[in-house]
C-alpha cells in the first residue's frame, strides 16, 4: 500500500514528507509543510479527531458546546444530502416512495445550512488550518475507518477516501471515489 503509493507519487513529481506518528508532532509538521494529501491508517485519524476536540474545548468555556452543535448540524446536513443525492450504502432499487420522500428532505437542509455555515466560519476553517490549510484529500488504509470519524471529517470539509488491499496480494484493490463518496464503504475495484 505505502510503497505503491510512494512510487506513484514520485512518478508524478510530488514531494514526499514524513513525520512521526505522535499526533502533536504530526500536526506541527502539517502546519509547517501544508500538505495537500496524506495517506495514513485509521488510528492516526482517530488521534487527529481527539486532538481537534481537545484543542476546541480548551480555547473558550462554551466553545465545546457550540462546536458540538455545529458539528452535529454539519453531519446531519451531509447525511441528508447523501440521501437526497443517493450516496447511501444501500444496494437495492429505490422505490417511488423513496424518491418522493427524498424531495421533502430539502426542508431540513434549508434550516441546517446556516448552522453549518456559521460552524465553518468560526470552527471548521480553524480545524482545516490545523492540517496546514491546503489539505484536500486524506487516504485511510490498513484497517476499517470508523464511521464516526468518516462522518466527522467529511462533514467539516476534510475529504477522506478509504482504500482496501493486502500487501501480500495487491497493495490497493479498492478505493472510494473522492468526488462522490459513499461513507462507510471502500469503493469500487480499481
Spans of features found by a protein language model:
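Conserved coil-to-alpha-helix start sites within the AMP-binding
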Residues: 1-12
